[in-house]
Each structure stands twice: as C-alpha cells, then as structure tokens.
Design a protein with these regions (language model features):
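Short acidic, glycine-rich surface-loop motifs adjacent to enzyme active sites
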Residues: 192-209
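Residue-level marker for buried hydrophobic side chains located in beta-strands
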Residues: 46-48, 81-82, 121, 200, ...
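Extended active-site neighborhood of metal-dependent phosphoesterases/phosphodiesterases
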Residues: 92-197, 219-235, 245, 249-301
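Active-site glycine-centered loops adjacent to acidic/histidine catalytic or metal-binding residues
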Residues: 51, 84-85, 124-125, 203, ...
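N-terminal active-site segment of His-dependent metallophosphoesterases
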Residues: 30-101, 153
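Short, solvent-exposed aromatic-acidic interface loops
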Residues: 301-307
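N-terminal secretory signal peptides and thylakoid transit peptides that target proteins
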Residues: 1-20
Length: 307
C-alpha cells in the first residue's frame, strides 16, 4: 500500500518510484514513512477503475460486472472514480454508428451494477466518435461522451467530506489542458480554502514512469507541476490510467498514481511481452482502492483481478 504524508517523504531525493510486491497480488508500492492509523480518521474510501474498454468480445461484460460486484463486497467503497476509455473504442477511422451505439449500450447495462453508487468519470481518448457524419451530429466528439457518462462537463469538480475532487480533460493538442480549462483549474485551486486536500483525475498520467516505457503522458506536465507546487498545501494526489500500467510516483509531496486497467490486455490473454495471462507488460488487470484521510494523507493500492 502506498501512503503519502505531507512534507515528510523523500525530502532529499524528491522522487521515488514504486516497486512491485513480490507476491504479484499486492500494490505497486513505495516505502513511505509509517503512520499509526489509530491516530488518523478515514474520510473516504474510493474505488478507481479505468480503461474498462467494454465491448462484446472476450465475455467482457460479464467479467466486468463480476469484478464490480467483487469491489462492492470486498471494499465497500463510498463511491467510484472512472478514469476513461470506458468503451472499447469509438475513435478509430473505421468505427460506424451501430458500433458506437452498441458499445455504449453495453456500458449502460454494466454500470447498472453500480446503481446505488455515485460514479464520477472522465473522458478517455477512445470514448469519442470523431468520424460521425458531421461535426453537427449529436454523437460527434466529447459532448456525446459527457451525455453518456452522465457527467456535468468535460472537466468539473465536486467535494466530499473535507476533500475536493477535480476531473480533467486531457484530450486536447499533444495531450494537454486547453487554455480555457487551465485557467479554470487555476481559479479552482485558488478559491479553495488553505490546506483543502485535493485529488485530481485525468485519463492521462501527468507525472510518472509509465510514460518512459510507452509514452502517453501530459505534454504540459511541467506547467501543471508548477501549478501544483504553488498550491502544495492542497494538491495531494493525481490519478490516471491510459497506459494500462501500475505506477506510483512521489514528486514534490504529490502522489501520482497510474492505476493500471480494468481490462488489462484489453480483456485478451496478452502477447509475448505480457508477464502473465491478461497482463499488459508487467501489470495485471485490476483496479485501485484509495483511502483518503481527514488529515490529507492518502493510501492507494492496486488490486489485480482474475475475472
């Protein structure tokens, strides 16, 4: 399990990269300062799922439903965060209307498993249909995804207990926040009371090691890092998916978690580089659980699944 305590972790080095637990079933974890949980009060338990890539093949719908039921039974989360790429793919040039409709209908059916839970989603790069008949078509682009995911906007925020949550849209030029969104984020962080613990979620990693292996990270990472440094009393953790790899990185007292993929190797068995069945490289299919404490500390643990 990964725990972050403000201003106490690796002050000299500044950066630590997670290591794989030898069992292969635990979190990809770093070695933080030990804390007595008896002195901390848990504010929220949050499930983070990402890169579901739901579709008809590989019996994926039933497997996904079983995993969601497992999460509910085992962890009893307060709510769910969905990191994007919810459907198999709508972005390829050869995708047609019926395929998009079918994928979203499967998503709708699966997500009824969580009908008693709030699900806060962000948009992934495979969710939007760019080859709709025209830009005026109701299913073109991000607006349709916003509608299907039942979210208020392509980027938005909300608060729970004493924590604030910011959901970003990195689906812009070179994987970045557009200027309108960045200015909104600046104001959003500025208006928060001092020391408000804040979690941010983007589909794409902002910082971490997975980008070194497979790319796919925010091109505006330095700009965002500087903004987070300005609000270092608030920004505690940044979640992502996209790369289907599990990685925890600490930098400047912020915990960056790329939390693998529910679909692993897109619900398939894998390839020559897969470390095990269903793995993408060394990461098995899975999901993450976060413990968010009243004092602003964070624990993020990645749980492989075998569904």
């Amino acid at each position: 399990m990964t725990t972050l305590k403000r201003r106490s972790l690796l002050k000299a080095a500044g950066l630590a990269v997670g290591a794989v637990a030898t069992s292969g079933l635990s979190a990809f974890a770093s070695n933080p300062e030990k804390q007595d949980k008896k002195t901390k009060k848990l504010a929220l338990s949050v499930a983070h799922i990402t890169d579901v890539h739901i579709g008809e093949g590989e019996n994926a719908p039933e497997r996904f439903k079983k995993c969601l039921k497992h999460i509910i039974t085992k962890h009893k989360p307060d709510f769910f965060l969905n990191g994007g790429d919810s459907i198999g793919d709508a972005s390829y040039d050869n995708v047609v209307y019926d395929q998009v409709i079918k994928q979203w209908s499967i998503w709708d059916d699966c997500i009824t498993t969580l009908d008693k839970y709030e699900v806060h989603s962000c948009i992934g790069n495979h969710d939007s249909w760019w080859k709709a008949p025209s830009k005026e078509h109701e299913m073109y682009g991000k607006d349709y995804v916003v509608k299907r995911l039942k979210i208020p906007n392509r980027y938005y925020s909300f608060s729970k207990k004493n924590w604030h949550f910011i959901v970003l849209d990195g689906n812009n030029a070179n994987i970045s926040l557009d200027q309108e969104q960045y200015e909104w984020l600046e104001k959003e962080l500025e208006k928060l009371p001092a020391s408000t613990p804040t979690l941010l979620m983007s589909h794409y990693p902002i910082l971490g090691t997975t980008q070194v292996l497979v790319g796919g990270g925010h091109s505006d990472c330095k700009k965002l890092k500087d903004l987070f440094q300005k609000h270092r009393d608030k920004v505690r953790v940044c979640l992502s998916g996209h790369n289907h790899l599990s990685d925890n990185t600490h930098y400047n007292d912020v915990l960056y978690c790329c939390n693998g993929a529910m679909s692993g190797f897109w619900w398939g068995i894998g390839d020559a580089e897969s470390a095990g069945p269903g793995y993408y490289l060394e990461t098995p299919p899975g999901y993450a659980m976060l413990n968010l404490y009243e004092d602003g500390t964070v624990e993020n643990e990645y749980f492989p699944h075998t569904y």
